[in-house]
């Protein structure tokens, strides 16, 4: 029983840490073509993509007024 609890806690912690990588992603393009020997070799074309996504306060509940996310204000920056 204890082994299952420890395994479940470790799996949950791993999923939480794996999701943290998505939260620190950057939308800036920073590619570089270094030491390219020809005219057409090593050309880099990157387009920075920024899509503001508002995901705070989006929960599903049966009774919306008792929801802890009710009344939250979210702003896209």
Curated annotation (Swiss-Prot):
Mutagenesis or variant effect for residue 62 to A: Significantly reduced ability to form amyloid fibers in vitro, decreased formation of aerial hyphae and rodlets, no change in spore chain formation
Gene Ontology BP term (one): cell adhesion
InterPro entries recorded: ChpA-H
Subcellular location: Cell surface; Secreted, Cell wall; Fimbrium
Leader sequence residues: 1-25
PROSITE patterns given in the database record: CHAPLIN
Consequence the record notes for mutating residue 74 to G: In minimal chaplin strain, forms very sparse aerial hyphae, no rodlets form
One Pfam family recorded for the sequence: ChpA-C
Domain Chaplin: start-end pairs: 36-76
Practical applications according to UniProt: The small chaplin mixture (a cell wall extract of an rdlA-rdlB knockout) forms a stable coat on a number of surfaces (including Teflon and cotton) and emulsifies oil-water mixtures, which could be useful in medical and technical applications.
Subunit structure as annotated in this protein's UniProt entry: Homodimer; disulfide linked. About 10% of ChpH isolated from cell wall forms disulfide-bonded homodimers.
Entry similarity comment: Belongs to the chaplin family. Short chaplin subfamily.
Entry comment, domain topic: Has 2 domains capable of forming beta amyloid structures, both of which are required for aerial hyphae formation while the N-terminal region is not required for rodlet formation.
Stated name of the protein: Chaplin-H
Organism: Streptomyces coelicolor (strain ATCC BAA-471 / A3(2) / M145)
Name of the gene this protein is made from: chpH
């Amino acid at each position: 029983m204890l082994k299952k609890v420890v395994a479940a806690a470790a799996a949950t912690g791993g999923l939480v840490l794996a999701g943290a990588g998505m939260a620190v992603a950057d939308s800036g393009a920073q590619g570089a073509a270094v030491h390219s020997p020809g005219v057409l070799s090593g050309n880099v074309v990157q387009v920075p993509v920024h899509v503001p996504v508002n995901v705070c306060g989006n929960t599903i509940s049966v009774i919306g007024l008792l929801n802890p996310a009710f009344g939250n204000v979210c702003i896209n920056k």
